[in-house]
Amino acid sequence: MKFLLDENVPISIKKVIQDNGFEAFTLHDFNMLGIKNGKVVELALNNNAIILTLDSDFLNLNKNLQLKSRIVYIKLHPRDPVKLRKIVDSFLKKYSLKLNNSFKLTLTETDEVYEPL
């Protein structure tokens, strides 16, 4: 399983994902910083990757992109890197078998909302 980290996700999360046995890459790896969310989705689709983001705008993509994409949105304020690592680690252990089809998933410190599409 592959994950594409949106540019707002700390690079340290890449290691958390890799330590759990999954592939992870960033927009920086593709030299594509600053691209629009639709292009991030296209990049993820072309690489069969799940988008991991802190940007709630990904929850409001047009319907066509939503039906194709796999998005994990992490709602965390303030953005504490230690808490973020714990949330991602817990998510990977809990959801890794459910991530094959299109979905939106919102994670917080205390709650999860999984929406298959």
Regions found by a protein language model. Give the residues of each.
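Metal-dependent nucleic-acid phosphoesterase active-site entry motif
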Residues: 2-11, 109-111, 115-117
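Small/polar loops that bind or transfer phosphate-bearing groups
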Residues: 5, 53-54, 76
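N-terminal first-folded block
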Residues: 3-47
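Ribonuclease/tRNase effector modules and their secretory precursors
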Residues: 18-19, 89-94
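Acidic, metal-binding active-site segment of PIN/NYN-like and related structure-specific nucleases
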Residues: 44-62
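Charged phosphate-binding loop/patch that engages nucleotide di/tri-phosphates or the phosphate backbone
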Residues: 95-117
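Mid-chain, well-packed structural core segment of small domains
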Residues: 59-91
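Hydrophobic/aromatic beta-strand patches that form the interior of the parallel beta-sheet core
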Residues: 25, 52, 72-74, 105-106
